[in-house]
Amino acid sequence: MGVSDKYVRKVKVSCASLRSYTVELRREVIKEAFDKILKKIKILVNIEGVLIRGEYKGSILMLSPKGRIAIIKGPEEEKLKEFLDDLFS
């Protein structure tokens, strides 16, 4: 069990060719998860209470306050777990 298992409820591949994923967080730890993520990403856009767009390890992350994260140009599918574990560590 990795670090990300505490925070991640479900992961879906949005587009395999673009390495895009949708990550759904566990409701009970959304705030804690966002606090960890915000310490690690470079914030590009912050529309207060609507969307945060940031960059992490060459990938674009879009965080919604409802606990969804879109990852664009993310790691290969086999390395996604490692990427998420590092993001939440």
Describe the role of every protein-language-model region:
Residues 21-27, 50-55, 71:
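Generic recognition of long tandem-repeat/solenoid scaffolds
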Residues 59-89:
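Short, compact, well-ordered microdomains
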Residues 40-52, 86:
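Acidic, aromatic-enriched beta-alpha/helix-loop junctions
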Residues 1-45:
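Short Lys/Arg-enriched alpha/beta "domain-start" segment
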